[in-house]
Amino acid sequence: MSKLVLASASPRRRELLARLGLPFTIQPSRIDESVYRHLPPAARVEALALAKARAVAAGLTDALVLGADTLVVCEGRVLGKPDSPAAAARMLAFLSGRTHTVYTGVAVVQAPRGPEGVTHARTAVTFRHLTPDQIEAYVATGEPLDKAGAYGIQGRGALLVAGIEGDYFNVVGLPLVQVEELLAIFGVDVWGRV
């Protein structure tokens, strides 16, 4: 098997990929994400995941590079990572009592410029009706500040969620079924290594 490289600095993606039992290294990508803003959410996360994987793959040989990107969309509005506690509070107030969609694109590229595979997952998440005190308390934990949509379902943010429809791991940031399916296309047998 070629060396597996995760093109992400996300600790959540690192933890999730480790669940597959495959050895991998981490090499975060650096791309200009703004050039993809015009694309609809599913196409955007796929394009960004592929761009991230390609950027890292270009500097490697004999490696499979996994890229990913996640967006939160509510009522047509894309919610990225908040840039301040106040922005996080505004996002959470907006999400309160609503259903939003989490999209994660996943791409695998055979380095340096070999075959590529890309897909995405989509999960609907419904928030509870949140009080201003609940929002303030959650923001005070610091948890929402580095996450798209200003919450982490795998942490205390789970208390904000009334329900989900779809892949939980997608909401965390890496849909493992799609990752396994893409890696299988490149000859990686996750089941044989667990």
Curated annotation (Swiss-Prot):
It is found in: Cytoplasm. It holds the Pfam family Maf. Keywords: Cytoplasm, Hydrolase, Nucleotide metabolism. It comes from the Bacteria. One of its GO terms (cellular component) is cytoplasm. Its main location: cytoplasm. One of its GO terms (biological process) is nucleotide metabolic process. This is dTTP/UTP pyrophosphatase.
